[in-house]
From Swiss-Prot:
Gene name for this UniProt entry: guaC
Protein name per UniProt: GMP reductase
EC id: 1.7.1.7
Entry superkingdom: Bacteria
Active site per UniProt: C176
Length: 328
Protein backbone atom coordinates (compact mmCIF):
# COMPACT_ATOMS: atom_id res chain seq x y z
CA UNK A 1 0.00 0.00 0.00
CA UNK A 2 0.95 3.61 -0.18
CA UNK A 3 3.03 5.42 2.37
CA UNK A 4 1.64 8.95 2.07
CA UNK A 5 -2.01 9.46 1.27
CA UNK A 6 -3.42 12.90 0.60
CA UNK A 7 -6.34 14.59 -1.04
CA UNK A 8 -6.84 17.80 -3.00
CA UNK A 9 -6.94 20.12 -0.04
CA UNK A 10 -3.73 18.67 1.42
CA UNK A 11 -1.64 19.72 -1.58
CA UNK A 12 -0.17 22.99 -2.77
CA UNK A 13 1.64 23.23 -6.08
CA UNK A 14 4.85 25.28 -6.01
CA UNK A 15 5.31 28.11 -8.54
CA UNK A 16 8.11 28.09 -11.11
CA UNK A 17 9.51 31.13 -12.95
CA UNK A 18 6.95 32.52 -15.38
CA UNK A 19 7.77 32.65 -19.08
CA UNK A 20 4.64 34.45 -20.29
CA UNK A 21 3.73 38.12 -20.41
CA UNK A 22 0.08 37.40 -19.73
CA UNK A 23 -1.94 34.35 -18.75
CA UNK A 24 -3.89 34.70 -21.99
CA UNK A 25 -0.82 33.29 -23.78
CA UNK A 26 -1.30 29.98 -21.96
CA UNK A 27 -2.86 27.11 -23.88
CA UNK A 28 -5.30 24.93 -21.91
CA UNK A 29 -6.14 22.52 -24.73
CA UNK A 30 -5.68 18.78 -24.42
CA UNK A 31 -5.45 15.92 -26.89
CA UNK A 32 -7.69 12.98 -26.03
CA UNK A 33 -8.59 10.08 -28.29
CA UNK A 34 -7.04 11.70 -31.34
CA UNK A 35 -8.96 14.96 -30.99
CA UNK A 36 -8.09 18.23 -29.33
CA UNK A 37 -10.41 19.81 -26.76
CA UNK A 38 -10.44 23.28 -25.19
CA UNK A 39 -10.12 22.08 -21.61
CA UNK A 40 -8.98 18.92 -19.79
CA UNK A 41 -12.43 18.85 -18.24
CA UNK A 42 -15.57 16.79 -18.83
CA UNK A 43 -18.92 17.27 -17.10
CA UNK A 44 -19.97 14.13 -15.21
CA UNK A 45 -22.14 11.70 -17.18
CA UNK A 46 -24.96 12.10 -14.67
CA UNK A 47 -28.60 12.87 -15.27
CA UNK A 48 -28.53 16.11 -13.29
CA UNK A 49 -25.40 17.36 -15.08
CA UNK A 50 -25.78 16.60 -18.78
CA UNK A 51 -28.57 16.23 -21.32
CA UNK A 52 -28.70 16.28 -25.11
CA UNK A 53 -28.84 20.07 -25.25
CA UNK A 54 -25.72 20.50 -23.11
CA UNK A 55 -23.92 17.70 -24.97
CA UNK A 56 -24.59 19.52 -28.25
CA UNK A 57 -23.45 22.86 -26.82
CA UNK A 58 -20.20 21.31 -25.54
CA UNK A 59 -19.46 19.46 -28.78
CA UNK A 60 -20.18 22.54 -30.92
CA UNK A 61 -17.83 24.62 -28.79
CA UNK A 62 -14.85 22.30 -28.71
CA UNK A 63 -15.35 20.72 -25.29
CA UNK A 64 -15.34 17.00 -24.51
CA UNK A 65 -18.53 15.46 -23.13
CA UNK A 66 -19.93 12.04 -22.18
CA UNK A 67 -23.69 11.54 -22.41
CA UNK A 68 -25.24 9.62 -19.48
CA UNK A 69 -26.81 6.16 -19.89
CA UNK A 70 -30.01 6.61 -17.92
CA UNK A 71 -32.34 6.89 -20.93
CA UNK A 72 -30.92 3.93 -22.85
CA UNK A 73 -33.57 3.94 -25.56
CA UNK A 74 -32.54 7.42 -26.76
CA UNK A 75 -28.89 6.56 -27.40
CA UNK A 76 -29.15 5.23 -30.95
CA UNK A 77 -30.87 8.38 -32.19
CA UNK A 78 -28.50 10.53 -30.17
CA UNK A 79 -25.46 9.02 -31.93
CA UNK A 80 -27.12 9.37 -35.32
CA UNK A 81 -28.15 13.00 -34.77
CA UNK A 82 -24.80 14.14 -33.37
CA UNK A 83 -22.92 12.61 -36.28
CA UNK A 84 -25.34 14.03 -38.84
CA UNK A 85 -24.51 17.46 -37.43
CA UNK A 86 -20.81 16.72 -37.83
CA UNK A 87 -20.31 16.51 -34.05
CA UNK A 88 -18.67 13.77 -32.02
CA UNK A 89 -20.90 11.14 -30.43
CA UNK A 90 -19.78 10.17 -26.93
CA UNK A 91 -22.06 7.83 -24.99
CA UNK A 92 -22.13 5.63 -21.88
CA UNK A 93 -23.03 1.96 -21.55
CA UNK A 94 -23.44 -0.45 -18.65
CA UNK A 95 -22.66 -4.16 -18.64
CA UNK A 96 -26.07 -5.85 -18.66
CA UNK A 97 -27.09 -8.21 -21.47
CA UNK A 98 -29.15 -5.61 -23.34
CA UNK A 99 -26.04 -3.43 -23.61
CA UNK A 100 -24.33 -6.15 -25.68
CA UNK A 101 -27.30 -6.07 -28.04
CA UNK A 102 -27.16 -2.28 -28.16
CA UNK A 103 -23.51 -2.37 -29.31
CA UNK A 104 -24.48 -4.84 -32.04
CA UNK A 105 -27.41 -2.64 -33.11
CA UNK A 106 -25.08 0.35 -33.46
CA UNK A 107 -22.87 -1.71 -35.77
CA UNK A 108 -25.85 -2.95 -37.81
CA UNK A 109 -27.04 0.63 -38.26
CA UNK A 110 -23.56 1.62 -39.43
CA UNK A 111 -23.07 3.89 -36.43
CA UNK A 112 -19.71 4.08 -34.64
CA UNK A 113 -19.69 6.47 -31.69
CA UNK A 114 -16.33 8.23 -31.45
CA UNK A 115 -16.26 7.56 -27.68
CA UNK A 116 -17.93 4.86 -25.59
CA UNK A 117 -17.64 4.94 -21.80
CA UNK A 118 -18.30 1.75 -19.87
CA UNK A 119 -19.48 3.18 -16.63
CA UNK A 120 -20.16 1.13 -13.53
CA UNK A 121 -19.44 1.84 -9.87
CA UNK A 122 -16.93 -1.00 -9.45
CA UNK A 123 -15.17 -1.18 -12.78
CA UNK A 124 -12.48 -3.70 -11.80
CA UNK A 125 -14.63 -6.66 -12.82
CA UNK A 126 -14.91 -9.46 -15.35
CA UNK A 127 -18.14 -7.86 -16.57
CA UNK A 128 -16.30 -4.70 -17.63
CA UNK A 129 -13.43 -6.66 -19.20
CA UNK A 130 -15.94 -8.66 -21.27
CA UNK A 131 -17.71 -5.49 -22.39
CA UNK A 132 -14.42 -3.84 -23.42
CA UNK A 133 -13.61 -6.89 -25.54
CA UNK A 134 -17.12 -6.94 -27.04
CA UNK A 135 -16.97 -3.27 -28.08
CA UNK A 136 -13.45 -3.63 -29.46
CA UNK A 137 -14.59 -6.60 -31.53
CA UNK A 138 -17.84 -5.07 -32.85
CA UNK A 139 -16.90 -1.37 -33.05
CA UNK A 140 -13.09 -1.39 -33.27
CA UNK A 141 -12.94 2.32 -34.22
CA UNK A 142 -14.62 3.52 -31.01
CA UNK A 143 -12.38 4.98 -28.31
CA UNK A 144 -13.28 3.02 -25.16
CA UNK A 145 -13.13 4.56 -21.68
CA UNK A 146 -13.63 2.08 -18.83
CA UNK A 147 -14.27 2.56 -15.13
CA UNK A 148 -14.54 3.30 -12.41
CA UNK A 149 -11.44 1.98 -10.70
CA UNK A 150 -9.15 2.89 -7.82
CA UNK A 151 -6.05 0.70 -8.07
CA UNK A 152 -3.05 0.25 -10.38
CA UNK A 153 -3.98 -3.43 -10.90
CA UNK A 154 -7.38 -2.39 -12.19
CA UNK A 155 -5.89 0.19 -14.57
CA UNK A 156 -3.45 -2.37 -15.95
CA UNK A 157 -6.11 -5.05 -16.41
CA UNK A 158 -8.59 -2.78 -18.17
CA UNK A 159 -5.88 -1.37 -20.44
CA UNK A 160 -4.73 -4.92 -21.19
CA UNK A 161 -8.32 -5.88 -22.08
CA UNK A 162 -8.33 -3.09 -24.68
CA UNK A 163 -9.54 0.04 -22.89
CA UNK A 164 -8.17 3.23 -24.48
CA UNK A 165 -8.53 5.18 -21.22
CA UNK A 166 -9.57 4.44 -17.65
CA UNK A 167 -11.66 6.44 -15.21
CA UNK A 168 -10.33 6.62 -11.66
CA UNK A 169 -12.41 7.36 -8.57
CA UNK A 170 -14.57 5.24 -6.27
CA UNK A 171 -16.99 7.28 -4.23
CA UNK A 172 -15.23 10.65 -3.71
CA UNK A 173 -18.05 12.64 -5.32
CA UNK A 174 -20.13 15.16 -3.40
CA UNK A 175 -23.38 13.24 -3.87
CA UNK A 176 -21.77 9.82 -3.64
CA UNK A 177 -22.08 7.98 -0.31
CA UNK A 178 -20.34 4.74 -1.31
CA UNK A 179 -17.63 5.54 1.23
CA UNK A 180 -20.22 5.72 4.02
CA UNK A 181 -22.47 2.86 2.93
CA UNK A 182 -19.72 0.35 2.13
CA UNK A 183 -16.49 1.47 3.80
CA UNK A 184 -14.71 1.27 0.42
CA UNK A 185 -13.33 3.78 -2.00
CA UNK A 186 -11.01 6.68 -2.73
CA UNK A 187 -12.99 9.32 -0.81
CA UNK A 188 -10.54 11.38 1.25
CA UNK A 189 -7.49 10.22 -0.74
CA UNK A 190 -8.67 10.57 -4.35
CA UNK A 191 -5.66 12.63 -5.41
CA UNK A 192 -3.21 10.06 -4.02
CA UNK A 193 -5.20 7.26 -5.68
CA UNK A 194 -4.96 9.14 -8.98
CA UNK A 195 -1.19 9.45 -8.61
CA UNK A 196 -0.88 5.75 -7.72
CA UNK A 197 -2.97 4.69 -10.74
CA UNK A 198 -1.27 7.12 -13.14
CA UNK A 199 2.13 5.60 -12.37
CA UNK A 200 0.81 2.25 -13.63
CA UNK A 201 -1.08 3.59 -16.64
CA UNK A 202 0.20 3.58 -20.20
CA UNK A 203 -2.97 5.23 -21.54
CA UNK A 204 -4.90 8.35 -20.49
CA UNK A 205 -6.70 8.57 -17.17
CA UNK A 206 -9.86 10.50 -16.36
CA UNK A 207 -9.88 11.62 -12.72
CA UNK A 208 -13.47 11.32 -11.53
CA UNK A 209 -14.78 12.79 -8.31
CA UNK A 210 -13.76 15.01 -5.43
CA UNK A 211 -13.14 18.20 -7.43
CA UNK A 212 -14.33 21.15 -5.36
CA UNK A 213 -12.37 24.08 -6.83
CA UNK A 214 -10.78 25.03 -10.15
CA UNK A 215 -7.36 24.60 -8.55
CA UNK A 216 -8.21 20.92 -8.14
CA UNK A 217 -8.22 20.59 -11.94
CA UNK A 218 -4.58 21.72 -12.05
CA UNK A 219 -3.73 19.36 -9.18
CA UNK A 220 -5.34 16.46 -11.08
CA UNK A 221 -3.24 17.25 -14.15
CA UNK A 222 -0.11 17.41 -11.95
CA UNK A 223 -0.79 13.89 -10.67
CA UNK A 224 -1.43 12.32 -14.04
CA UNK A 225 -4.96 13.03 -15.26
CA UNK A 226 -5.49 13.75 -18.96
CA UNK A 227 -9.16 14.63 -18.34
CA UNK A 228 -10.93 15.65 -15.15
CA UNK A 229 -14.57 14.69 -14.66
CA UNK A 230 -16.59 17.20 -12.68
CA UNK A 231 -20.06 16.91 -11.17
CA UNK A 232 -21.01 19.40 -8.46
CA UNK A 233 -19.12 22.35 -9.99
CA UNK A 234 -21.19 21.86 -13.15
CA UNK A 235 -24.50 21.42 -11.32
CA UNK A 236 -26.94 24.26 -10.77
CA UNK A 237 -26.48 26.15 -14.03
CA UNK A 238 -29.16 27.77 -16.15
CA UNK A 239 -28.75 25.01 -18.72
CA UNK A 240 -28.52 22.19 -16.15
CA UNK A 241 -31.31 19.61 -16.27
CA UNK A 242 -34.02 20.04 -13.65
CA UNK A 243 -36.31 22.81 -12.51
CA UNK A 244 -35.19 25.90 -10.68
CA UNK A 245 -36.57 25.90 -7.13
CA UNK A 246 -36.54 28.28 -4.22
CA UNK A 247 -35.26 27.01 -0.86
CA UNK A 248 -34.86 29.42 2.06
CA UNK A 249 -35.01 32.36 -0.34
CA UNK A 250 -32.22 30.95 -2.53
CA UNK A 251 -32.52 29.93 -6.17
CA UNK A 252 -31.37 26.30 -6.36
CA UNK A 253 -31.34 23.23 -8.59
CA UNK A 254 -31.34 19.56 -7.62
CA UNK A 255 -28.19 17.49 -7.91
CA UNK A 256 -28.24 13.76 -7.18
CA UNK A 257 -25.89 10.82 -7.44
CA UNK A 258 -26.19 8.18 -10.14
CA UNK A 259 -26.82 5.46 -7.57
CA UNK A 260 -29.37 7.47 -5.60
CA UNK A 261 -33.01 6.47 -5.20
CA UNK A 262 -33.96 9.60 -7.17
CA UNK A 263 -31.94 8.23 -10.05
CA UNK A 264 -33.11 4.63 -9.76
CA UNK A 265 -36.72 5.33 -8.84
CA UNK A 266 -36.41 2.79 -6.03
CA UNK A 267 -34.70 2.34 -2.68
CA UNK A 268 -32.36 -0.51 -3.61
CA UNK A 269 -28.56 -0.54 -3.33
CA UNK A 270 -28.59 3.20 -2.79
CA UNK A 271 -25.12 4.75 -2.81
CA UNK A 272 -26.02 8.30 -3.82
CA UNK A 273 -27.84 11.22 -2.25
CA UNK A 274 -29.63 14.36 -3.34
CA UNK A 275 -28.73 17.94 -2.56
CA UNK A 276 -29.64 21.41 -3.71
CA UNK A 277 -26.98 23.46 -5.47
CA UNK A 278 -27.16 27.24 -5.47
CA UNK A 279 -27.93 28.68 -8.90
CA UNK A 280 -24.70 29.50 -10.75
CA UNK A 281 -25.71 31.36 -13.91
CA UNK A 282 -24.64 30.24 -17.36
CA UNK A 283 -22.52 27.21 -18.17
CA UNK A 284 -20.38 29.08 -20.69
CA UNK A 285 -19.39 31.62 -18.00
CA UNK A 286 -18.22 28.80 -15.74
CA UNK A 287 -16.27 27.18 -18.60
CA UNK A 288 -14.61 30.53 -19.37
CA UNK A 289 -13.70 31.01 -15.72
CA UNK A 290 -12.25 27.48 -15.59
CA UNK A 291 -10.18 28.24 -18.66
CA UNK A 292 -8.85 31.50 -17.19
CA UNK A 293 -8.02 29.87 -13.86
CA UNK A 294 -6.21 27.06 -15.67
CA UNK A 295 -4.31 29.62 -17.77
CA UNK A 296 -3.17 31.23 -14.52
CA UNK A 297 -2.16 27.81 -13.18
CA UNK A 298 -0.08 27.16 -16.31
CA UNK A 299 1.68 30.51 -15.89
CA UNK A 300 2.44 29.71 -12.22
CA UNK A 301 3.83 26.38 -13.43
CA UNK A 302 6.38 28.26 -15.51
CA UNK A 303 5.10 27.19 -18.91
CA UNK A 304 2.59 28.11 -21.60
CA UNK A 305 0.97 24.71 -22.17
CA UNK A 306 -1.00 22.38 -19.92
CA UNK A 307 1.89 19.87 -19.73
CA UNK A 308 3.92 22.40 -17.73
CA UNK A 309 1.76 21.62 -14.70
CA UNK A 310 2.87 17.96 -14.73
CA UNK A 311 6.41 18.71 -13.62
CA UNK A 312 5.95 21.28 -10.85
CA UNK A 313 6.97 20.60 -7.27
CA UNK A 314 4.36 20.29 -4.57
CA UNK A 315 4.06 20.13 -0.80
CA UNK A 316 1.72 18.11 1.39
CA UNK A 317 0.10 20.48 3.87
CA UNK A 318 -1.54 18.28 6.44
CA UNK A 319 -3.59 21.05 8.05
CA UNK A 320 -5.64 21.69 4.90
CA UNK A 321 -4.86 24.71 2.76
CA UNK A 322 -8.10 26.50 3.49
CA UNK A 323 -7.28 27.49 7.09
CA UNK A 324 -10.94 27.64 7.88
CA UNK A 325 -11.86 29.52 4.68
CA UNK A 326 -14.78 27.54 3.35
CA UNK A 327 -14.86 27.66 -0.42
CA UNK A 328 -17.49 24.99 -0.84
Amino acid sequence: MMDVVFDYEDIQLIPAKSIVGSRSECDTTVEFGGRRFKLPVVPANMQTIIDEKIATFLAENGYFYIMHRFEPETRLNFVREMQQRGLIASISVGVKTEEYTFIETLAQEGLTPEYITIDIAHGHSEAVIRMIQHIKQILPESFVIAGNVGTPEAVRELEHAGADATKVGIGPGKVCITKIKTGFGTGGWQLAALRWCAKAASKPIIADGGIRTHGDIAKSVRFGATMVMIGSLFAGHEESPGEMQEVDGLQVKEYFGSASEFQKGEKKNVEGKKMFIEFKGSLSDTLTEMEQDLQSAISYAGGNKLQAIRTVDYVVVKNSIFNGDKVY
